[in-house]
Amino acid sequence: MNPKFLLLMSFLSFFGCGKKAPEYPADTLTTRDGTQITLTFFKHASLAIEAGGKCIYVDPVSGYADYAALPKADVVLITHSHYDHLDVAAVEAIQTPQTEILCDRTSAEAFEMNCYTMRPGSVATPRDYLKVEAVAAYNTTDGHLQFHPK
C-alpha cells in the first residue's frame, strides 16, 4: 500500500477523532408560517424549546445539562416538585430578572420569587407569545403508580 496514502489516512483519522457529536440531541421543526422551533432534549423530562429568539425550559435539572452554558430562559415550566423535575440551582443558572416561572403550588414554595402557580385546568399567559394550559398527568406504569397517583 502506498505510504503517502497511509500517512494521509492516519492524519485524517487522528483529527477526525477530535470531533464530538452534539452534546444534546435537538430537532428543528418549521411551522406553517415559517417559524423555526428547535426542541433540545437533555434527559428524562428536561428539554428546551427555542423559537423566535425566545427560550423556554421544561423541568431543568442540573444533572442532565450544563445550564450555565446554555441560553438564558424567558420562561421555565416546572411540572411538579419531584427532584427529577424541580432543581432550583438549574433554574437559577438560566434565569434573569425577567424570567417567568410556571409551576404548581408546591414547586412555587422552592423559589424566592413570584411564580405563576398552576393546577390542572388553569391557563396562564406569561408572555404575549405563550399560552400554557395545565393538564393532569399520571404515571400508570407498573411499579411507578406511587409517584403520580391518579
Task: Outline where the language-model segments fall.
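Active-site metal-binding motif and surrounding structural segment of the metallo-beta-lactamase
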Residues: S62-S107
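Glycine/small-residue-rich loop that forms an oxyanion/phosphate-binding "nest" at active or ligand-binding sites
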Residues: L102-T106, F111, C115-P120
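Short, conserved acidic/polar surface loops in the N-terminal third of protein domains
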Residues: V88-A89, M113, G143-Q146
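C-terminal motif of bacterial Sec signal peptides marking the signal peptidase cleavage site
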Residues: F14-G16
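Core dinuclear metal-dependent hydrolase active-site scaffold
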Residues: K20-P71, T117-K150
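Short, linear, compositionally biased motifs with a strong N-terminal bias
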Residues: S10-L12
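Sec-dependent signal peptide recognition
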Residues: N2-L8
